[in-house]
């Protein structure tokens, strides 16, 4: 009973917070001048179930410690998945002229580390994602990034001590999105980056595990060549946009993931030098923070809305900003969490109370 209660708390935290395969997997290191080396895609996508490598997993509360890393174990049911799909459908049925809608669901890290002895510990991500897609309207463009991410499973794509994907993991999600959206993804081969070392994330904070403490993370963020004007908006007005910076470079330590978009702002906007007529809004939780900056390489305008905190006139904002593409990007837990689904639905009702975990 105690484990079940703790699991419900963890699922709520995972959907609500902003915030390597083994300890030998690179965690990027502290060198702030490095560029990310992206490995070429292998020809064959690896199987989901890996051979038994002798590694033993230990449950500490709702965190599964395995291969010197922390994981949450997904077990979402189809009923909640269908409710999520119905909410996405409701935006399609508003029939906003010229608005193209995408849905991208992000798997969690354990999906790519399952070994034979633990194959029944968590529900396969693709089973849950495809069940949602099956319940969605055909007009919605559905993006399952599992295969693209799996091709890179030996890279540093999820944190060791935190539930989020790294910026490299988010990059492979971005590549999946580009394939569906008819875009050319930027190559990271020559993009400079900076790194924030010494990151101990949510799993460490929940468990205080010495195993996780001895396998700390680092947070890498990319310095893209195109100039970006970054603005912070408000729920109270469609016209207020205060100029700021896309990266909160002052953060460190346990807050390092908040470098992306300054954490979980209710709404922010990025305007670029691209003049291609493509303007996108994202509805996200914190997984979207590391993902969103990549879109500045492809869109003239990117607006990011956190459904947990934004209570303004969302539909009015889409129209006022000339948005013609709408992406829902949520991790697989959030897509099966009642309060999160409720808050996405509530965006169509300005000022409605926010559901809590």
Model-derived features: where do they sit?
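Bacterial N-terminal signal peptides
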Residues: 8-15
């Amino acid at each position: 009973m105690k484990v079940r209660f703790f699991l419900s708390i963890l699922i709520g935290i995972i959907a609500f917070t902003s915030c390597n395969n083994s300890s030998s997997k690179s965690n990027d290191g502290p060198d702030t001048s490095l560029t990310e080396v992206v490995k070429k895609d292998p020809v064959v996508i690896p199987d989901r179930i890996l051979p038994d490598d002798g590694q033993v997993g230990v449950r500490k509360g709702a965190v599964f410690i395995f291969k010197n890393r922390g994981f949450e174990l997904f077990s979402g049911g189809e009923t909640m998945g269908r409710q999520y799909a119905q909410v996405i459908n409701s935006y399609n049925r508003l029939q906003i002229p010229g608005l193209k809608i995408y849905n991208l669901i992000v798997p969690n890290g354990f999906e790519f580390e399952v070994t034979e002895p633990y194959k029944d510990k968590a529900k396969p991500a693709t089973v849950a994602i495809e069940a949602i897609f099956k319940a969605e309207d055909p007009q919605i463009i559905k993006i399952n990034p599992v295969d693209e991410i799996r091709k890179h499973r030996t890279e540093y794509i999820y944190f060791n001590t935190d539930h989020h994907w790294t910026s490299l993991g988010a990059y492979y999600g971005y590549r999946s999105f580009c394939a569906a959206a008819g875009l050319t993804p930027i190559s990271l081969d020559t993009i400079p980056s900076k790194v924030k070392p010494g990151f101990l994330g949510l799993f460490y904070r929940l468990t205080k595990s010495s195993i996780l403490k001895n396998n700390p993370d680092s947070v890498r963020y990319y310095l893209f060549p195109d100039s970006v004007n970054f603005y912070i908006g408000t729920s109270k007005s469609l016209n207020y946009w205060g100029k700021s910076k896309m990266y909160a470079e002052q953060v460190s330590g346990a807050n390092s993931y908040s470098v992306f978009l300054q954490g979980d702002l209710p709404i922010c906007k990025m305007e670029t030098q691209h003049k291609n007529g493509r303007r996108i809004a994202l509805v996200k939780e914190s997984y979207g923070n590391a993902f969103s900056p990549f879109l500045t390489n492809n869109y003239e305008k990117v607006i990011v809305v956190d459904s947990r905190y934004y209570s303004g006139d969302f539909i009015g904002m889409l129209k006022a900003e000339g948005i013609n593409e709408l992406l829902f990007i949520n991790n697989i837990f959030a897509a099966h969490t009642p309060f999160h689904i409720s808050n996405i639905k509530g965006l169509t009702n300005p000022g409605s109370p926010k559901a809590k975990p």
